[in-house]
Amino acid sequence: MVTVEEVRNAQRAEGPATVLAIGTATPSNCVDQSTYPDYYFRITDSEHKTELKEKFKRICDKSMIKKRYMHLTEKILKENPNICESMAPSLDARTNIYAVEVPKLGKEAAEKAIEEWNQPKSRITHLVFCTTTGVSMPGADFQLTKLLGLGSSVKRFMMNQLGCFAGGTVLRLAKDLAENNKGARVLVVCSEITVVTFRGPNDTHFDSLVGQALFGDGAAAVIIGSDPIPNVERPLFELVSAAQTLLPDSKNSICGELREIGLTFHLLKDVAELISNNIEKSLVEVFQPLGISAWNSIFWVAHPGGPAILNQVELKLGLNPEKLGATRHVLSEYGNMSSASILFVLDEMRKSSTQKGFDTTGEGLKWGVLIGFGPGITFETIVLHSVSTQGSFGIRDWDYNFGIEFKIIFIPYLVLGIS
């Protein structure tokens, strides 16, 4: 008779979770940041608020954003005038748009990831869908299974209202699913549109004005699985370890509330300082087992929360300017897309590494970090292990060495409960 331990061992994958494919999508409507203040104050019938408009222009000028993509076109906004008001009841109109467009945009990203993966959709065993845009039942996860034609037995997980750190959360969940379910292939989708946060300017809600200058629309999808099939599946990154950290006494620094007027966004002035002063604690937690403490020796996949946060993190950790290059590129080209942002950065990291001639997907480096932050303040930190960019498929020659490193370095920490 078999033992429970034997059953469990048979259920688990042998190797670490890997990123097997990445896909991204945006709405077709692109807005230029340099002309956005004029458009925003015109479409919201707020051109008489000249002082506020000048403040908004300065925010946009300092945002380090060149352009963003938005589903809300001028036509849609004119058809839904309450969305343009600062405090008008408009949740019904916003929900009608969200319920259709969030799964639809997610489908575009998912199809690109599946195309890169180049495997039949029937091999997808789990679906994790994440959005901060809204809530419905059945959720966007259900809608996406129908849009993609996934099997009825796919195990679904729906995550709502987590905010900007959620791109790390879904990867942490997908890692656990892949490593504890032999043969699992997890489709992860983050889809965000600004339909619930867009509103007209208000003199008493300056933090909302900051959000209007930063947030954009986008969806990203990744396929996660352990033990990739040699010569069939090509890993892009390995997910080595993951941690979540909650910063004490910071719950009101970043927060949002879903109300009749939509999702209200609150951002305190001390957010950049709080994040930069505490980010190293999260790094030490996951990299101490590896003996890594030089933050310029790893590649960086960081959430593009905003220029002030990136500048202070760079200064506090003494990072070389190029370390946050992929993050700054995504911020410049797309803005802050909440949960989807960090997956865009992951995609940019692997693409730019190849384009620049590096020999790994992590800018020629072996180890890297994916770090997200958002409401809580919550940090999601994942240790990444890059792979070769030389075109080899499946398990690489040095995967064996990585397995030895993992057992020697990490297992004692896990057994002893050291973090």
Swiss-Prot record:
<dbReference type="InterPro" id="IPR016039">
    <property type="entry name" value="Thiolase-like"/>
</dbReference>
<dbReference type="InterPro" id="IPR012328">
    <property type="entry name" value="Chalcone/stilbene_synt_C"/>
</dbReference>
<dbReference type="Pfam" id="PF02797">
    <property type="entry name" value="Chal_sti_synt_C"/>
</dbReference>
<keyword id="KW-0284">Flavonoid biosynthesis</keyword>
<dbReference type="InterPro" id="IPR011141">
    <property type="entry name" value="Polyketide_synthase_type-III"/>
</dbReference>
<comment type="similarity">
    <text>Belongs to the thiolase-like superfamily. Chalcone/stilbene synthases family.</text>
</comment>
<dbReference type="Pfam" id="PF00195">
    <property type="entry name" value="Chal_sti_synt_N"/>
</dbReference>
<feature type="active site">
    <location>
        <position position="164"/>
    </location>
</feature>
<dbReference type="GO" id="GO:0009813">
    <property type="term" value="P:flavonoid biosynthetic process"/>
</dbReference>
<dbReference type="GO" id="GO:0030639">
    <property type="term" value="P:polyketide biosynthetic process"/>
</dbReference>
<keyword id="KW-0808">Transferase</keyword>
<comment type="function">
    <text>The primary product of this enzyme is 4,2',4',6'-tetrahydroxychalcone (also termed naringenin-chalcone or chalcone) which can under specific conditions spontaneously isomerize into naringenin.</text>
</comment>
<dbReference type="GO" id="GO:0016210">
    <property type="term" value="F:naringenin-chalcone synthase activity"/>
</dbReference>
<dbReference type="InterPro" id="IPR018088">
    <property type="entry name" value="Chalcone/stilbene_synthase_AS"/>
</dbReference>
<comment type="pathway">
    <text>Secondary metabolite biosynthesis; flavonoid biosynthesis.</text>
</comment>
<protein>
    <recommendedName>
        <fullName>Chalcone synthase D</fullName>
        <ecNumber>2.3.1.74</ecNumber>
    </recommendedName>
</protein>
<keyword id="KW-0012">Acyltransferase</keyword>
<dbReference type="InterPro" id="IPR001099">
    <property type="entry name" value="Chalcone/stilbene_synt_N"/>
</dbReference>
